[in-house]
């Protein structure tokens, strides 16, 4: 059965270097000896028997037996099948137990609570994003704006009857909204197939399939295509740190630990109730890297954000003494996971120019975004969880007491250039009793809005790329709920409408101001002006682009206005306000753009100064007249 053609891909699969294992294992149409049918393959090296069951044979175990090769790959050719036929593999262990397993390489699935795989033909979609892909190849992502809107597709909006939006619905509405709001990228919380709604997609059973909750694979292609035509990049939340124990999934696939580590001290996340991939097993490496490569190739995805990287890197992650195995050197690093991540990043970034990878890594593990050839993991970006935790703690503090925690606002600059960072205000920060972004701010109703505007302004002008979870842009008050849409009705209220308008304009200002993104990864792009005025809750800094043009950013995290506040500046010229959170259109109390003439008075280590009036709870951005 096409043996000569398949032998080399099988060799690479068993070697751990086949990054297109989908071409070997995903069911596909074929013509053999003049007969039309579908080829199925599945890796189950320790199974006693495997047969294909489905609609076509009444789900009768053994009716369509598969043949095993020397490497543990079972295969069969079946005539008379059609797209959308449901199927599973009936895998019989050496102990004689038969379990019906979904296809690890399945392209489409039944909608939960059903769990069967479904035949699908990915061919036929006519992409219209060639211009986007070409521009992506030519872009330097480190010196370009990156402002990400994080979305859970099932709860961004819902129909009046409570039903979810389809991929096609989202292509009609979400794309237009993200473009109107001036974001550069959208990040989908996991869309790879998963059985349990309450996992938010983080317990994956189908790494090669967009969830059928919202439509077909072609529908998902259409959604990505629409984003690209609108000039928006698409990032997937990518879950390869663990997988669920659902019987139809990967757990004990052939009756033995096949995809997971055999020792539960490495192979189980007790706290999450899930299994851990065996990153040292060649076939598992081929499977995982092929999955990411598959989405980049077939769905034109622009990047992946790898979830829970810390849990992959540390053998003692969320484990007590005696519950974990040290590595060969006696340490707590998972050396196999490190090597796997390095190989994954090299493979993906080599195969897809302009594609990028992001690590959600919550510790101080070194060199996450450094090249593998010097010992790094090879990611393009890392989430800056330290910045997020510190600054959220700061805004949760009453303004009167913020002087005691002023360092939480400024500390991130001591390490801001040690990695290529993304500043994340993600879904994790607006659930489980943590409150929504706006409700974290412990002041009056009116001041909550001004405080959130100030905080978002701080994020957008701080070194690092940006990410904001849906709802934060208009000040959603209640926590995120995965089974309901956002509270769009709030936009009927002026303060929420003003908040949305503010975020839209702030995003536009960021995107049009190279000083705020062209030197995110080097010290030359930043200079503190006022860093330690904790008594007045004021900070200020300069952001520079590569040509030397700059903006002066002034932030007041107190509700008390500051009059004639002396601010050091580099030039003896006029400084004009080019952006302010207190404009009336945003619900503030002023709409003018003030201008200040510099004086020959040194301040903050700079040769000149301006005496500015700083509104309470505000961000104000100035440009020198000669810019």
Question: Model segments located where?
Answer:
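The feature marks proteins involved in alpha-glucan
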Residues: 1-39, 67-150, 155-162, 169, ...
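Conserved, mostly hydrophobic/aromatic
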Residues: 42, 89, 151, 178, ...
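C-terminal beta-strand-rich structural cap/linker in extracellular carbohydrate-active enzymes
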Residues: 83-87, 592-627
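Substrate-binding/active-site clefts of carbohydrate-active enzymes
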Residues: 110, 130-143, 152-332, 612
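Conserved alpha/beta catalytic core and glycan-binding cleft of carbohydrate-active enzymes
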Residues: 113, 300-302, 317-483, 490, ...
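Catalytic cores of secreted or luminal carbohydrate-active enzymes
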Residues: 495-516
């Amino acid at each position: 059965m096409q043996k000569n053609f398949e032998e080399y891909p099988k060799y690479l699969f068993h070697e751990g270097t086949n990054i297109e294992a989908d071409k070997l294992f995903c069911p596909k149409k074929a013509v053999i000896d003049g007969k039309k049918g579908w080829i199925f393959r599945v890796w189950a090296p320790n199974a006693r028997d495997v047969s294909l069951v489905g609609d076509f044979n009444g789900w009768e175990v053994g009716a369509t037996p598969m043949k095993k090769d020397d490497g543990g790959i079972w295969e069969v050719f079946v005539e008379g099948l059609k797209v959308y036929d449901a199927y599973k593999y009936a895998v019989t262990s050496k102990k004689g137990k038969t379990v019906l397993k979904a296809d690890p390489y399945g392209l489409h699935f039944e909608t939960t609570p059903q769990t069967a795989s479904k035949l699908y033909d990915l061919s036929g979609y006519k992409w219209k994003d060639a211009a986007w892909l070409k521009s992506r190849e030519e872009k330097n992502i480190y010196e370009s704006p990156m402002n990400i809107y994080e979305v859970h597709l099932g709860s961004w909006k819902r129909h009046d009857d409570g039903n979810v939006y389809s991929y096609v619905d989202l292509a009609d509405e979400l794309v237009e909204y993200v473009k109107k709001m001036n974001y550069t990228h959208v990040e989908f919380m996991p869309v790879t197939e998963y059985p349990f709604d309450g996992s938010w997609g983080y317990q994956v059973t189908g790494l090669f399939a967009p969830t059928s909750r919202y439509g077909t694979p072609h529908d998902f292609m259409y959604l990505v295509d629409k984003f690209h035509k609108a000039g928006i990049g698409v990032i997937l939340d990518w879950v390869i740190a663990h997988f669920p124990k659902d019987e139809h999934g990967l757990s004990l696939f052939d009756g033995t630990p096949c995809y997971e580590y055999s020792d539960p001290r490495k192979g189980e996340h007790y706290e999450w109730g899930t299994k851990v991939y065996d990153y040292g097993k060649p076939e598992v490496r081929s499977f995982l890297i092929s999955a990411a490569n598959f989405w980049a190739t077939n769905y034109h995805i622009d990047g992946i954000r790898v979830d829970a990287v810390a849990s992959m890197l540390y053998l003692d992650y969320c484990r007590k003494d005696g519950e974990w195995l040290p590595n060969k050197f006696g340490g707590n690093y998972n050396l196999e996971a490190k090597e796997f991540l390095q190989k994954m990043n090299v493979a993906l970034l080599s195969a897809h120019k302009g594609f990028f990878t992001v690590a959600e890594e919550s510790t101080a593990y070194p060199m996450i975004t450094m090249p593998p050839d010097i010992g790094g993991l090879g990611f393009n970006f890392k989430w800056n969880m330290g910045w997020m935790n510190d600054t959220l703690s700061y805004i949760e503090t009453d303004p009167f007491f913020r002087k005691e925690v002023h360092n939480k606002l400024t500390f991130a600059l001591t390490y801001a250039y040690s990695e290529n960072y993304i500043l994340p205000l993600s879904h994790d920060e607006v659930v489980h009793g943590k409150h929504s972004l706006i409700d974290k701010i412990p002041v009056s109703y009116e001041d909550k809005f001004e405080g959130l505007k100030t905080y978002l302004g701080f994020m957008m002008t701080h070194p690092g790329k940006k990410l904001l979870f849906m709802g934060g842009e208009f000040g959603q008050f209640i926590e995120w709920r995965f089974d309901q849409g956002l509270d769009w009705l709030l936009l009927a209220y002026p303060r929420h409408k003003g908040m949305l308008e503010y975020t839209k304009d702030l995003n536009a200002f960021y995107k049009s101001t190279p000083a705020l993104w062209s030197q995110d990864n080097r010290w030359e792009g930043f200079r503190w002006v006022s860093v330690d005025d904790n008594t007045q809750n004021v900070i200020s800094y300069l952001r520079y682009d590569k040509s030397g043009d700059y903006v002066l950013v002034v932030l007041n995290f107190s509700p008390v206005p500051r009059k004639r506040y002396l601010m050091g500046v580099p030039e003896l010229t006029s400084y004009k306000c080019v952006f302010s959170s207190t404009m009336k259109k945003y619900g503030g109390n002023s709409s003018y753009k003030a201008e200040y003439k510099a004086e020959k008075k040194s301040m903050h280590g700079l040769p000149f100064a301006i005496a500015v009036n700083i509104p309470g709870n505000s961000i104000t951005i100035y440009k020198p007249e000669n810019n």
